[in-house]
């Protein structure tokens, strides 16, 4: 995490350009084992777990796969972020923090039953909520155009609002000290729930 913060600070101080990669999906896979591989620590951790009498595979299988898509484009986006991080290029991946990811399925009496994948039920230790970067997003409503002596003024009226809250996730490239950032946006209601209405 220190190298992640240092690299972000270095990019800001140097004023270098940053690449923004937007995708509706990012199939990153399980972060723990991927990060160990990329840092060259996988075998050392496997051996340390074994020496402590712990089943490394069983423990790594406990991590929920981030439910951030379900197709080839999501895997491609993840590979791009990983590669750009490995190349030590400053990159920010931008996507949606889906509350429920890919569906789970089971077969009951010969019929496929789909269930939601509540991948965030135990939280996500890899993400950092960034409420100070939250923004209002307006949708629906009407657009009113007004011509004034200063030109065209556009006003958005009677819109609905949600609060977009970002969560940052470090993407550690292969044997690098410059992690990329995956910023996932979560939507929250601006209004509190009124139990009395």
Residues covered by each model-derived region:
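A conserved ligand/cofactor-binding region detector
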Residues: 1-197
């Amino acid at each position: 995490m220190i190298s992640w913060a240092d690299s972000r600070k270095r990019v800001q101080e140097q004023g270098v350009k940053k690449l923004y990669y937007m995708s509706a999906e990012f199939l990153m896979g399980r972060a723990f084992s991927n990060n160990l591989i990329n840092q060259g620590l996988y075998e050392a951790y496997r051996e340390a777990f074994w020496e402590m009498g712990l089943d490394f595979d069983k423990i790594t299988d406990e991590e929920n796969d981030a439910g951030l898509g379900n197709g080839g484009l999501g895997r491609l986006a993840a590979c791009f972020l990983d590669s750009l991080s490995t190349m030590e290029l400053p990159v920010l991946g931008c996507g949606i923090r889906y509350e429920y990811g890919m569906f789970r399925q089971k077969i009951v009496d010969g019929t496929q039953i789909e269930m939601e994948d509540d991948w965030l039920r135990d939280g996500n230790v890899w993400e950092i909520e960034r409420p100070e970067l939250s923004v209002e997003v307006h949708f629906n409503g009407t657009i009113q155009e007004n011509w004034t002596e200063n030109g065209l003024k556009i006003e958005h009226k009677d819109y609905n609002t949600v609060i977009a809250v970002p969560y940052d996730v470090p993407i550690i490239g292969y044997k690098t000290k410059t992690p990329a950032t995956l910023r996932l946006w979560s939507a929250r209601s601006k209004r509190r729930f009124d139990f009395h209405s």
